Amino acid sequence: MTFRIAVVQPICHPPGSDAANIADAERAIARAAGEGAEFVCFPETYPGPWRMPATFDPTAAMVEAAVKHRTHVVFGTIAPIDAKAATAHNLICMAYPDGRAPARYRRTHPNGPWIYTGGPAWEFQWVPGDEFPVFDTVHGKVGLAMCSEVYMPEVARALALRGAELIFMPAGKDKRKLWATWRTLIWARAIENLAIVVTTQNLFDHSERGLAMVASPEDILFESTIAGTAVVDVNLERVRYLRATRDQVGSSEACAAKQGVLGPQWQRPELYERIYPRPQREAAE
């Protein structure tokens, strides 16, 4: 069954005026739903807030918009832990069209807290999460991740092994010299996990180079570097076929991705602990 995903790459109100992003997001949801979108994907930390102490929480507004327009809304915010210590989890959430409590993923990588302090946009002491939840929807199983976790293949693989067929991995802001490798890795995560992977990012002005993208295991379905919203048709039947079937001699004549790489034909989990022993890690300084 084909369904539609709206990928929103907004001009973002910066820290200090970021509460204004909520109204912009509500308008984008209404427009996307009017074009038949059953998922609307915003960037990391959009609508916000970007900093601690948090001055607003967009969750109720995003849930209300999802219910009003009968769509799923993937959005970014933070979950304050301690206002005095300025600690928070960084979240990617998904609001449901039936109004249930939103799905939430707490960013897990890298080791915190250094990544969200000292720059011009974010300012909080990030506390990593430690779970890789996967969420059921009427269209398929959804995994959530974010931003430079694309450089950690373990994140998307964990979601895929838990059944995620559609992985939203929205990002924060201008990637500068990382742009080309980032783009490559979004598609790589789709190829190696036999999944649809979706990303987008915030733009603070029209001079910045964006990266909005929908990748399947066999093709890039959509990509854009400019501000705006695109509605993309997606079908998970091919993903399910590639996962359910076995690779064999000559299969490359019909398949542009390797079949069955998540299953026992390819996987050898008994080797992986020897390859990569996992000592207890300290947080990075």
Describe the residue ranges of each PLM region.
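CN hydrolase (nitrilase-like) catalytic-core segments centered on the catalytic cysteine
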Residues: T55-F75, K141, C147-A230
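Cys-nucleophile CN-hydrolase/nitrilase-fold catalytic domain and related Cys-dependent amidase chemistry
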Residues: P15-R106, K175-I191
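C-terminal beta-strand edge segments of enzyme domains
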Residues: N202-E285
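Active-site-proximal beta-strand elements of phosphoester/diester hydrolases
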Residues: T2-P14, R104, G140-E149, F168
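Short beta-strand scaffold segments in enzyme catalytic cores
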Residues: F75-T77, N90-M94, P133-F135, G210-V214, ...
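Acidic/histidine-rich helix-loop elements
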Residues: I11-A20, T117-P120
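Active-site beta-loop-alpha junctions enriched in small/polar residues
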Residues: P10-H13, I78-P80, R106-P110, C147, ...
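Active-site catalytic loop in hydrolytic enzyme cores
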Residues: A83-R162, K175-T184
